[in-house]
Amino acid sequence: MSERNQQDGQFDKLTIKIASDDVIRNEWSRGEIKKPETINYRTFKPEKGGLFCEKIFGPTRDWECACGKYKKIKHKGIVCDRCGVEVTLSKVRRERMAHIDLAVPVVHIWFFKTMPSRIGNVLGMTSADLERVIYYEEYVVINPGQTDLERKQLLNDTEYREAQEKWGRDSFVAKMGGEAIRDLLASEDLQTQLVELKDKLRKTKSQQARMKLAKRLKIIESFVSSDNKPEWMIMSCVPVIPPDLRPLVPLDGGRFATSDLNDLYRRVINRNNRLKAILKLKTPDVIVRNEKRMLQEAVDALFDNGRHGHPVMGAGNRPLKSLSEMLKGKQGRFRQNLLGKRVDYSGRSVIIVGPELKFNQCGLPKLMALELFEPFIVKRLKDQGYVYTIRSAKKMIQRHAPEVWDVLEDIIKGHPVLLNRAPTLHRLGIQAFEPVLIEGKAIRIHPLVCSAFNADFDGDQMAVYVPLSIEAQLEAKLLMMAPDNIFLPSSGKPVAVPSQDMTLGLYYLMLDPLYIRENHELKTRVFRDSEEVLLALQASGSYNWYEEGSKSPNGENRSDYLRGIRIHEKIKLRTENGIIETTPGRVVFNTIVPKELGFQNYSLPKKKMGELVMQCYKKAGLEATVRFLDNLKSIGFAEATKSALSMGVCDVKIPTIKQKILHDAHERVAVVRKQYEDGIITEGERYSKTISIWTEVSDVLSEELFKLISEVKDSTMNPLYLMMDSGARGNKSQIRQLGALRGLMAKPSGDIIESPITSNFREGLSVIEFSISSHGARKGLADTALKTADSGYLTRRLVDVAQDVIITEDDCGTLNGIDVSAIKQGQEELLPLKDRIFGRTVCEDIYQPGDSTKLLAKSGDTLTVLQAEAIDDSGIESIRIRSVLTCETRRGVCAKCYGINLANSRSISMGEAVGIIAAQSIGEPGTQLTMRTFHLGGIASAGLTPEIVADDNGILVYTDLRTVKTDEGNWVALNKNGRLNIVKDEGRTLDEYKKLLSTKSIEPLQAFNVELGTKILLEEGTKVKPGTRVAEWEQHNIPIICDRPGYVRYEDLVEGLSTERDVNKQTGQAELIVKQHRGELHPQVAIYADQACEDLVGTYPLPAGAIISVEEGEFATAGKMLARLPRSAIKTKDITGGLPRVAELFEARKPKDSAEIAKIDGVVDFRGVQKNKRIVVVRDEMTGMEEEHLISHTKHLIIQRGDHVVKGQQLTDGLVIPHEILDICGVRELQKYLVNQVQEVYRLQGVDINDKHIEIIVRQMLKKVRVIDPGDTSLLYGEEVDKKEFEVENQKVSQEGGKAAQATPVLLGITKASLSTESFISAASFQDTTRVLTEAACAGKTDYLVGFKENVIMGHIIPGGTGFDRHKRVKMFVDSEQEQGLEFNFAD
């Protein structure tokens, strides 16, 4: 049902309710169907009174009744007196419905089987009990009368008969089946129930019971507040959908193809008719009951086949598609027909490269254009008087008359077309171009737009769409043309950057000088200006003639020939800024550079190219940039061709020292093997060390190889190096495999095979090496196929959760923001501050540190690149910026909190669909990530350096570091969160430095995070020089270290229970290993000051898997390793960690092996064991507050007794549970954690996504709160409501002087967040369709069509982008309705 808006015939809202029998019979239906027949198989005419009856549904032929008495349009509206058919259009058969009157009421399966069961909740009965009643197994008491039976009590046959004998037939009422349920529902008093439930809620203390009650209360409340009556969930008649929606199509050979629904309806009618017949006769009860049950099952199958019992099978043993299946899933009504419509005026063809095109053009095959623009051509042909009827125009077009081509040329001018390549992962997958007519049948596209479409020319196809209306053409022209889309919306980086051949040509042109005349005792040439250089180049005839001592082409001797100028010769050139040294090649390049950029005098790999394009856009504007890009394309292809670059097998050099290095490595591996056999190290360590040795060899050989191929000999360069260095093709790892060695490979399981492939591709692989190689290659391909689907699904969920987020106002006026700082890993800066703050709005005035007169940015400024750089250079560590996470706009977000539009570096416009842009920006690289695994062929990389080396002169200072000095004179770190700092030598004392560091008054030159067990080689306060080794750490084990000297005693190390002796097979050496156990033991090593073991110094709990390194009774010195826990063997770093990790974060799932985190600030203490778990206590010294943590033995503690921890710090290894961060540290910390964790995964892959996109998704995950105390509001305990709705409700109550409700924020995963949207249409089209619709119908929900999806489904213009203003009017109407106190609410 919908309310229409008179002026444009569009409705504003849609309400869904339960249909009562009255509505079905009197409002929807045109008549009752009594026969199961469909059509007469001889005449092919519909049977009367059957499922296709013309009397009920309307005529099968336009303006013709069934018997043929009336046959023309003039009889319109007459009902034939012979056959009873109304004379009208046959299309009414698509809209007229009928009904089937049932002999007994049946239960609608959705309301009974969709959990939580609505009927069960209203009646307060369990599903199992209901099922027994509905399917005629037991009686239920409806009215106990004077007996001592209870209402709703179940009775089986025997009990029912006994009760009748005991109290008499008419003393009580008990029934079974749908009828019984209907009577119960009708006699249910919902108002009293509500009062009772609220009363119970107030009295109960138990959480579980309260949740249960609140759930039930919500369902009953929804019935009370809507006009739905509970008994409508039981049907006494079934609606029949129009026949043309379930057609019966004759196939050749006299057979018919039919929709499954017809079979399901026939079953219902057959059973219903049989039941009616049986009821007329006096039939035994058992048979009647069975027949009634069969009717109930037939109706169930019609509505939702397979929900109850076995699904009904059709021909070929396939389950029939019921009404529910028609809606569900990818092939269902929502996703197939409403969201994924087909487009008219479209074509598709293979694409080929069109290097001659301009940036805004595409080549369109003539024949295709003729077909696509046909209506336009027809109109133009008529206007110009070539033809008079449409038919003759079409004929003219079919015979390809010459006039037609002229007309087509004319029409196409200024009429853009859209090109699209599937999969469309982000908005750059559809762009508009000016068509250029070409011969042939392939579409031509400009080489620079390929990267946006992710297209290549190995047979890709693209689709062409023609925008028809003037508005559509305008949008295409103004917003979608390729030149307007040269930056990625995800990061603001240019996407139209020359690649492959173009990069190669440009790099070749811009090479550093290869030929220096001074080396040949000649003078460097000097030129007046660029013109002169170009003239000299033209005159020199030859292009790159390098052969020493050879004859010139036309036989003159060499000295004469050298008057010619070489493209890579060093020359001097006069420019505006004085005389510079450059090469003729660079002069040629600078002829196309916009003058605003100045003279470019450096070599130009692909990375620099992107920066140059960006710079050009900022200094010279869009038009100049597009021109520049076109010129880059032309000159790049030209130079690549002229350079005649080729590559031969001999260009792949093999380092001469390869054999020696390999020999050394084999020896080192043998030493490790020997250590293992002697029992000094474990199997895991041996494996890890072997892998490390080979990784190192691989690196050393690569270095050698790159030295070798990057040499310039006789002013020529290695083409292989040229390709790699320019970024045109190939990367270091691939070239390493060609010339050095293939290196370590991974098994399909992800483990690294420890014997590497020592051959390279130039030498060729042996058979065994080939087999190992194929492992990696196959895994790559299999992964790709699987993960592409995963990634697509992630994008779909992201779009669904963020689709409603649009820019709805300019400034929400909030004072809140988030603090951002540069992202560092150890000492290197991964992402500088300027990149994180550029284009964002600052919350407060920012002054130069130490100079409060110099204002760097005013509060409310959107930072430009220059401002961002100035702030970064000034040494400010972190600044506060506005963010969508703190935006206070009621619906959508505001422009100030969002910042700039990355796609064009301008401020974001109203109505921009930033949510969808965010979802695409995160999802699109997801597919890239998944597709990127196999290029390395499963090559293993294990990165972590085992030593810390100083880079600067300075003084070594420890901070937050507990150390102990060992006998060898080193210091060992005892905790995990300490740092080593190297600070500038300013002649202060050590304590002063420490104080300055702790207050962040000085910045260390370098800061290293220190792992537990790191061996520090220098005392603090030592002066260090660059290259000094400061510390080293064991990368294969996590050590457990003794911090005070004493005698060792084992506690609870019981062999066979908590430990096992593992005899090393090679050596016979026994090792004591702590194993996982269930019991009251807590294995630890105790240290006593005396041999009698009375004076306890300290205890060290041992986690499962630890290998004990000390004997009982021996004297352990400080710093001695008591036990070691092998780090799990290194796995390859594949994105496999990536995509599932991103999904895990966005779905807010609990990670496997999660970490325990501290709930308060304080000092750590251990308190023994309880139920096989260690008790760790954190005690706040100031307040005396304590928090207990129970930690299982299998987890490794990363804190020691006496460590000071802060709230939210990890106590054990593993990943943190996001919900815990929310509970312990609050919303801000959680937001920061989620954004940083997601960014980390993408950064590892080198994918650049702006923070704001991830922030939008996180905002959507945190938009609900859970009510913990309803106060005087109408909210329920444990109910999850929108933050905004909660605030409105509280305002209302506090104005009336009542008690406000209390709530805590909840974190929802993206799937759950999408399903909990206010719009039931949007939720139903996403997932769980039946559940969403059932819930909405019970509550009589209204959808105000405010989001995108709902409007697409309804066929309205979407309320974003250019459709935004149009919906402003609707918003006014909604706001006025709200003021009148009508109840409804919006998605956030």
From Swiss-Prot:
Please cite one Gene Ontology biological process associated with this protein: DNA-templated transcription
Positions that bind Zn(2+) 1: C65, C67, C80, C83
Which Pfam families does the UniProt record give?
Answer: RNA_pol_Rpb1_1, RNA_pol_Rpb1_2, RNA_pol_Rpb1_3, RNA_pol_Rpb1_4, RNA_pol_Rpb1_5
Cofactor: binding details: Binds 1 Mg(2+) ion per subunit.
Superkingdom field: Bacteria
Which annotated residues bind Zn(2+) 2?
A: C812, C887, C894, C897
- Enzyme class (EC, first level): transferase
Q: Where does Mg(2+) bind?
A: D456, D458, D460
Alphabetical UniProt keywords: DNA-directed RNA polymerase, Magnesium, Metal-binding, Nucleotidyltransferase, Transcription, Transferase, Zinc
Query: What is the protein's known function?
Result: DNA-dependent RNA polymerase catalyzes the transcription of DNA into RNA using the four ribonucleoside triphosphates as substrates.
By sequence similarity, the record places it as follows:
Belongs to the RNA polymerase beta' chain family.
Its subunit composition reads: The RNAP catalytic core consists of 2 alpha, 1 beta, 1 beta' and 1 omega subunit. When a sigma factor is associated with the core the holoenzyme is formed, which can initiate transcription.
Name the record gives this protein? DNA-directed RNA polymerase subunit beta'
